[in-house]
Regions:
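C-terminal single-pass transmembrane alpha-helix
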Residues: 251-305
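N-terminal targeting/regulatory segments, especially signal peptides of secretory
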Residues: 1-255, 259
Length: 305
């Protein structure tokens, strides 16, 4: 696979920086929110004064911060910017306590379209807006498969932010590289994914990022990085793409058990001091179970009525 023209480590370093601008977690029954004042920069909805009112508005602002930071890097085209932004966004939504079932499509409608900052022309590029960048991958917003990719992203995000890669004991942490490789193989063989050009490109991006990790962990003998299969285009055997893209968050809730099952292999053992990505081990295993249990319960109650 061709080596990307941009610095992958700098990309994940930038994502880590933006990720640290705000967080929310449950502690002893209380919701603790931590924010950096900079996160309020891009929160202009209607006639508001520009201060983010909730976690989702902060996530929206964070996406612009990330796009702005990545856009200054050499070799990153708009579609690649959108890929990383949406991967990070889906991760950030999934780890939020009490997400209330807000998915990417809902987020796009309420926190991107309605955020005035997305439609402002980007400095030194009068023909482009941040919304236009996101729209290059808008199809990711309404399809369940993006959450499978987010599982892969969460592992990469964790591994790229380990303070000392040579000290990470992969055998004590459910062997993240092997988990990545197994899930990658599964997605690569899924006709819903390998039959879609955009998804194959995203698999290629994650594959490049994974291969780059091998160089970082080359001296760590406990971390085995299996070879990833070649990404081969195949004819999709899935239903009409329009039907897939039209399915909402609740409609796909019953189909996520496989994702939840595979995610449970991520260990809850953390590297001391790794606060930036401390939520990653529960990324799917807890956050998704909580979200989807509520959704399934709601659906069952509606069906009974």
């Amino acid at each position: 696979m061709a080596q990307p023209s941009y610095n992958i480590e700098n990309v994940y370093r930038a994502i880590s920086t933006i990720n640290g601008y705000f967080s929310e977690e449950k502690q002893y029954g209380a919701t603790i929110q931590r924010t950096d004042p900079i996160i309020h920069t891009y929160c202009h909805y209607g006639n508001t004064k520009g201060k983010c009112g909730n976690y989702f508005q902060m996530a929206s602002s964070g996406v612009i911060h990330l796009l702005k930071k990545l856009k200054g890097m050499s070799g990153l085209e708009c579609d690649k910017l959108a890929e990383y932004a949406i991967l990070w966004l889906s991760y950030k939504l999934a780890i939020k306590p009490n997400n209330n079932g807000i998915d990417l499509n809902h987020f796009y409608t309420n926190y991107i379209i309605k955020n005035n900052d997305y439609n402002k022309k980007i400095k030194n590029d009068d023909s482009l807006t941040y919304k236009a960048i996101i729209d290059t991958k808008k199809d990711f917003m309404n399809i369940k498969e993006i959450y499978n990719f987010s599982y892969l992203f969460s592992i990469l995000f964790y591994l790229y932010n380990v303070n000392n890669p040579n000290n990470l004991k992969c055998t004590n942490n459910s062997n993240y590289p092997e988990n990545f490789a197994n899930k990658f193989k599964e997605l690569n063989e899924d006709s819903n994914i390998n039959g879609n050009t955009s998804y194959r490109k995203l698999l290629s991006t994650l594959s490049d990022d994974y291969d780059n990790l091998k160089k970082i962990y080359v001296n760590n003998k406990s971390c085995n990085f299996p070879l990833l299969p070649q990404i081969e285009p195949k004819k999709s055997l899935a239903q009409n793409p329009a039907e897939i893209s039209g399915r909402g968050f609740e409609q796909i809730s019953g189909q996520t058990s496989e994702v939840i099952s595979s995610s449970s292999s991520i260990s809850t053992t953390l590297i001391p001091g790794l606060s930036v990505v401390s939520a990653i081990p529960v990324f799917l295993g807890i956050a998704y179970k909580t979200i989807y249990k509520k959704k399934i319960k709601k659906n069952n109650e509606e069906n009974e009525n």
